[in-house]
């Protein structure tokens, strides 16, 4: 354990930041799972709405430094591909 006051403060801040980032990461994963579950259920409107809600969450995760911008782009692309595949399946 740190003895210097500034090191103690940094340890406290690191713990607070870790907990905060964990909550944000959990929220991100939850929104991604909502899209996947909606697509798997076969409900197109629900899947599209879940995707619309997930995109800003993914983008804000990049701005907060939780994930890399390429990972965000990849996630959005894959989710969008699932939704579009469901739309094509529903149309035919």
UniProtKB/Swiss-Prot annotation:
Disulfide bridge map: none
Family matches, as Pfam families: Ribosomal_S20p
One GO CC annotation: cytosol
GO process terms (BP): translation
SUPFAM superfamilies the record matches: Ribosomal protein S20 (SSF46992)
Segments for region (Disordered): 1-20
Signal peptide positions (record): none
Keyword RNA-binding included in the entry's annotation: yes
Molecular function in Gene Ontology: small ribosomal subunit rRNA binding; structural constituent of ribosome
Alphabetic keyword roster: Ribonucleoprotein, Ribosomal protein, RNA-binding, rRNA-binding
Family: Belongs to the bacterial ribosomal protein bS20 family.
Purpose of the protein: Binds directly to 16S ribosomal RNA.
The protein's name: Small ribosomal subunit protein bS20
Organism: Methylococcus capsulatus (strain ATCC 33009 / NCIMB 11132 / Bath)
Native organism taxonomy: Bacteria, Pseudomonadati, Pseudomonadota, Gammaproteobacteria, Methylococcales
